[in-house]
């Protein structure tokens, strides 16, 4: 689904040198926008795409392409090959919602690479607007997974669903996970 951007809007990739603008956009919308966390996203090979109106960033999302997706809620590191893309953390500023801007932005995003791609995304089941937008983009739900964390080192979690690239970390075949100190340190280093 590709929708045109409105007049005065421009689709662009936000590079590491644009991090201060991203921090400002996050904070202007009530999010922490921690520079060190955004830096880790770039360090882990993630790419950020946005829509700009004038000098203002009004929407953005992150894409992982050929780099692993770490789902810290499950302690799963999911490898992605060169034909797989994980889209995450899409955001549209409140005053621009309801204008199908997310669809236009994602439509522009899928044209960035010429290689045929398989797209993945994760959405909270309580985020109905995002679920509707994902459905409009052609995504379909293939699994619902759950996790519960106890303290800093123990998880109860679903097993990875079939159809998802098989997670490589941390012991994805175990529903009950208790991490060692080294695993906890590794886990924290992956969160971005």
Locate each region found by the language model.
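Short, positively charged
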Residues: 19-35
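Anionic, Ser/Thr-rich low-complexity intrinsically disordered regions
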Residues: 62, 120, 150-152
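Conserved active-site alpha-helix within GNAT-family acetyltransferase domains
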Residues: 125-145
């Amino acid at each position: 689904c590709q929708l045109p951007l409105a007049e005065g809007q421009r689709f662009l990739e936000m590079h590491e040198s644009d991090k201060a603008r991203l921090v400002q956009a996050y904070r202007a919308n009530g999010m922490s926008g921690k520079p060190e966390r955004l830096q880790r996203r770039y360090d882990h090979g993630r790419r950020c795409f946005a829509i700009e109106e004038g000098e203002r960033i009004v929407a953005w999302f992150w894409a992982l392409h050929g780099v692993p997706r770490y789902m810290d809620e499950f302690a799963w590191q999911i490898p992605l090959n060169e034909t797989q893309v994980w889209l995450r953390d899409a955001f549209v500023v409140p005053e621009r919602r309801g204008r199908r801007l997310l669809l236009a932005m994602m439509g522009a995003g899928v044209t960035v690479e010429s290689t045929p791609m398989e797209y993945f995304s994760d959405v909270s089941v309580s985020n109905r607007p995002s679920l509707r937008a994902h459905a409009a983009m052609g995504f379909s739900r293939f699994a619902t997974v759950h996790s519960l964390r106890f303290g800093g080192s123990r998880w109860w979690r679903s097993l990875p669903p079939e159809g998802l690239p098989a997670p490589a970390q941390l012991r994805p075949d175990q529903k009950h996970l208790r991490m060692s100190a080294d695993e906890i340190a590794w886990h924290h280093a992956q969160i971005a």
